[in-house]
């Protein structure tokens, strides 16, 4: 059984294996993940179904997305699991995940270019090919947006919200999903993307490997919320236009519904509850 661990507790060998597996993914295969994520960035006013963001399926869609990536890593090294980044505890640019032997640190002040760690441009092994501008290197500006990372108290305030989601099922909704996603309230998920900066603050955010650690923690928070509340684990149940209902399969895979992904324990567990 795959066990997802807090990145702060990883051994040097576990870090090395994770980095090696990410770097061993073919560029074309990795770019598919980046492209898929970017294609599912939508606004409330866009026509058609909202699936990956600004909708109830934000959490099961990303759970399915992370499973796909984790399996890709395990095809390289079966011992690898996605670690998670608890940004409510590891809250600074000096935290262990930003070390040169893991993800590397922040970027240059003038252009955001990351200059240390295994994903820096100088290695020549991490070119950014799915991009929104001409820059072909990994960029970050840790903390540069001014607002600090979410606190544990802010996380707890969101976990206390009893209702998973509600109409209008978008970024105006006042439920757990939308507060966790960050369009309402204290702003958890979105705020972390902006804090990291660079590609993480855009639709091509999986270009930065920290994307996976961030979303593994978002997934863990969803699991914690599920254990805490007896209310329906996912809504809407059926018959809702422009969003994914409980038993409706999700694009682009068409093989999993939110109902299929409510219980993660058949795929992986976490090191702590």
UniProtKB/Swiss-Prot annotation:
User: What's the name of the protein?
Assistant: Tyrosinase
Q: Which reaction does it catalyse?
A: 2 L-dopa + O2 = 2 L-dopaquinone + 2 H2O; L-tyrosine + O2 = L-dopaquinone + H2O
Record Gene3D superfamilies: Di-copper center containing domain from catechol oxidase
Entry superkingdom: Bacteria
Q: What does this protein do?
A: This is a copper-containing oxidase that functions in the formation of pigments such as melanins and other polyphenolic compounds.
Task: Tell me the PANTHER family matching this sequence.
Answer: TYROSINASE FAMILY MEMBER (PTHR11474), TYROSINASE-LIKE PROTEIN TYR-1-RELATED (PTHR11474:SF126)
Q: Which Pfam families match?
A: Tyrosinase (PF00264)
The UniProt GO MF terms for this protein read:
metal ion binding; tyrosinase activity
User: Where does this protein hold Cu cation A?
Assistant: 37, 53, 62
Annotated Cu cation B binding lies at 189, 193, 215
């Amino acid at each position: 059984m795959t066990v997802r661990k807090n990145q702060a507790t990883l051994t040097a060998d576990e870090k090395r294996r994770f980095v090696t597996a990410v770097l061993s993914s073919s560029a074309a295969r990795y770019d598919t993940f980046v492209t898929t994520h970017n294609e599912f960035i939508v606004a409330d006013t866009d026509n058609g179904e909202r699936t990956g963001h600004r909708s109830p399926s934000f959490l099961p869609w990303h759970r399915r997305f992370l499973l796909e990536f984790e399996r890709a890593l395990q095809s390289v090294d079966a011992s690898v699991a996605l670690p998670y980044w608890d940004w409510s505890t590891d809250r600074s640019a000096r935290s262990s995940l930003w070390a040169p032997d893991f993800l590397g640190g922040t970027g240059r002040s003038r252009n955001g270019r990351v200059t240390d760690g295994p994903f820096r441009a100088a290695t020549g092994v991490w070119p950014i090919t799915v991009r929104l501008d001409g820059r072909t290197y990994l960029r970050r500006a840790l903390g540069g947006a001014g607002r600090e990372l979410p606190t544990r108290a802010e996380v707890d305030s969101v976990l206390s919200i009893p209702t998973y989601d509600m109409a209008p099922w978008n970024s105006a909704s006042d439920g757990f999903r939308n507060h966790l996603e960050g369009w309402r309230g204290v702003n958890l998920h979105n705020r972390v993307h902006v804090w990291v900066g660079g590609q993480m603050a855009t639709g091509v955010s999986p270009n930065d490997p920290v994307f996976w650690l961030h979303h593994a923690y978002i997934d863990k928070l969803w699991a914690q919320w599920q254990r805490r509340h007896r209310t329906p684990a996912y809504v809407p149940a059926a018959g809702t236009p422009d969003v994914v209902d409980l038993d409706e399969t999700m694009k682009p895979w068409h093989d999993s519904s939110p109902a299929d992904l409510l219980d993660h324990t058949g795929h992986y567990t976490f090191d702590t509850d």
